[in-house]
Amino acid sequence: MSNGNIVQCIGPVVDIQFPRDKMPNIYDALTLVDGGEKSFSEKGLTFEVQQQIGDGVVRAIAMGASDGLRRGMEVKSTGKPISVPVGPATLGRIMDVLGRPIDDAGPIATEERRAIHQPAPKFDELSPSVDLLETGIKVIDLVCPFAKGGKVGLFGGAGVGKTVNMMELINNIAKQHSGLSVFAGVGERTREGNDFYHEMKESNVIDKVAMVFGQMNEPPGNRLRVALTGLTMAEAFRDEGRDILFFVDNIYRYTLAGTEVSALLGRMPSAVGYQPTLAEEMGKLQERITSTKTGSVTSIQAVYVPADDLTDPSPATTFLHLDSTVVLSRDIAALGIYPAVDPLDSTSRQLDPQVVGQEHYEVARDVQMTLQRYKELRDIIAILGMDELSPEDKLAVSRARKIQRFLSQPFHVAEVFTGSPGKYVPLKETIRGFKMICSGELDHLPEQAFYMVGSIDEAIEKAKKL
């Protein structure tokens, strides 16, 4: 192990001079020797080497606040990448990017550690899966079903309900699912992390969840690496032969942190100011989130869509890696329909008659066709009114409006805001309900009976009271 000295500080990016023959490798972790008493900088501050500039100088990014750093301070090379604790001792704990506990519950009692940079599983180790994962959310189970061991993205702009949807999925899947979960909070609000922790605690599933946070207020180094920290913990459980749920909120902030770091390192930006290595960074992370023959990782990732533009390079790069995409729409949220999932924009590789069965496939396609017809007729209705439509079109519009309202559902996690108890709807009930609407069995019921109910029987009961 060699020691070096800081020669330049520019925000979180620090240049460190080492002896020429003892330069640390790329991604090696370095620690500050002088911190703590001698200055107000963080004690034992960790850096990660990003570039070797030459002449013994390396450029590193700080994994913590770089306040109080100055030239000449001594830095020690650890000779290995950042490693974090893994295994059962991490369950029920909240950790930061370096795997240090931040929940005031004492140290993490495990000797087992693993480097956060790992190669993706080899091609012959991968295990594709076609088992469906029931979420209890009607619109998702019907139009964009999830696969066990698959990858799911929740896409949406600001304030359309990504985090609430994510929390409901955690509530419905993680509590029913007997396996373990890992939650990585990447560059999101600290308040949401706090809410998540208390929710898990109240529902007594905290002992099955490991939580890693690198929130909005932290330097870009933390936000860039915290997804890898969470993933490393999930991989360790997977390699023991377990089935893991891996939640990431939010993948966009991972990209954004990469953009900040890239600019600080002096790389030329590419389209829209993103880092030139955007596709490679995303690929490195996403290729590791996968199921092997030993165990499975089912990942659910929230993806912020800047300015509601799905063609922005960051969400567009994320799309490539996913099995199911759940697109949240501001127009649907404006109608007061929650979850605001767009059934025409959301897709799933699992929506195939060989996977979900013929009945499910046909009902889902009927629902989409009816909604698509309504979308096409909307301009005519706006100009000429409903009276000018043919009887078939009037019927299609009436059914589409019922379907649209029946796609809404009260959530368990939103009970405090809505006052209506959350509903978990089994897949069979979902298919039966939409089949009845599409076949015309419920044409006589008013459309408001279908709004914010669980199963179709509740809608029929509600219609009697109207």
UniProtKB/Swiss-Prot annotation:
ATP binds at residues 156-163. Transmembrane segments: none annotated. It is found in: Cell inner membrane. Its main location: membrane. Keywords: ATP synthesis, ATP-binding, Cell inner membrane, Cell membrane, CF(1), Hydrogen ion transport, Ion transport, Membrane, Nucleotide-binding, Translocase, Transport. Its EC number is 7.1.2.2. It comes from the Bacteria. The keyword Ribonucleoprotein does not apply. Belongs to the ATPase alpha/beta chains family. Produces ATP from ADP in the presence of a proton gradient across the membrane. The catalytic sites are hosted primarily by the beta subunits. This is ATP synthase subunit beta. It comes from Polynucleobacter necessarius subsp. necessarius (strain STIR1). The lineage of its organism: Bacteria, Pseudomonadati, Pseudomonadota, Betaproteobacteria, Burkholderiales. The gene is atpD.
